[in-house]
Amino acid sequence: MEIITDIAPLRARLRHEASVAFVPTMGNLHAGHLSLVRIAQKHASCSVVSIFVNRLQFAPHEDFDRYPRTWSDDCRLLEEQGADIVFMPDEKTLYPVPQEFQLLLPPVADTLEGACRPGFFRGVTTVVLKLFNIVQPHIAVFGEKDYQQLQVVHRMVDQLNLPVEIIAGETVRDEDGLALSSRNNYLDATQRQEAGELAHHLKQIRDSIASGERDFPLLEQLAAEKLSKRGWVVDYVAVRQQHTLLPVAASDSSLVILGAAWLNQTRLIDNFLLTLP
């Protein structure tokens, strides 16, 4: 496995590869990330994983400074997984001058995470587009856990005619249903025991809809109330159309149930997909 920190040597290394699959990460890798790497390895002759904590997608009051940085462990895991290249640029490499150019985002980025975290998707699309231009992958793999991010990236690729195929990797969960996330490391032992409740209530909504319930606002309200009673601070619980993330109409059959909530000082997000017959 090669560790590359600058743009020119990375491009030189990749120039003659028949196919390149790319997994962008912010590090602090876990089994969910490694599942994305395995998908990448199945689809291309060369797998590239980037590790970069992107300041642009953090608001000033958010956790940029304390976001877990575990570079040595990350590289060990990636080497064990058989990744070909780890791209680890520093901030001056990706942002040598102030980043003045940014994208005008589509409506799908305005709701849910976009409403709760203004500027988040602007930062995400900026760094992903820069990384796509640097790596020039044929395939890029993103996790379904960050479902809205996945939809935003899909639109960016489609509408800007970027020559990369986006592949989604399924969410990896612990035994209690908690979606694996680097921010799970913020949880203490007691909070970790409670953290699976978000997934539990979203899954309950999914199962209720699958059983015929169609009062979506009521399902959202009940789940949010149950979480609040357990001490969570809920940003949103929402049943949406999978591709547009708009509220569901009676004719929609492809749904996603999304939630974001705070457990003490840790913000967790999750989602479950549902396709109705």
From Swiss-Prot:
(R)-pantoate binds at Q57, Q149. GO terms for cellular component: cytosol. Beta-alanine binds at Q57. It is an enzyme of class 6 (ligase). One of its GO terms (biological process) is pantothenate biosynthetic process. The active site is at H33 (proton donor). It catalyses: (R)-pantoate + beta-alanine + ATP = (R)-pantothenate + AMP + diphosphate + H(+). Its main location: cytoplasm. ATP binds at residues 26-33, 143-146, 172, 180-183. Its EC number is 6.3.2.1. It is found in: Cytoplasm. One of its GO terms (molecular function) is pantoate-beta-alanine ligase activity. Pfam families: Pantoate_ligase. Keywords: ATP-binding, Cytoplasm, Ligase, Nucleotide-binding, Pantothenate biosynthesis. It comes from the Bacteria. Pathway: Cofactor biosynthesis; (R)-pantothenate biosynthesis; (R)-pantothenate from (R)-pantoate and beta-alanine: step 1/1. CDD domains: PanC. Belongs to the pantothenate synthetase family. Homodimer. The reaction proceeds by a bi uni uni bi ping pong mechanism. Catalyzes the condensation of pantoate with beta-alanine in an ATP-dependent reaction via a pantoyl-adenylate intermediate. This is Pantothenate synthetase. It comes from Nitrosomonas europaea (strain ATCC 19718 / CIP 103999 / KCTC 2705 / NBRC 14298).
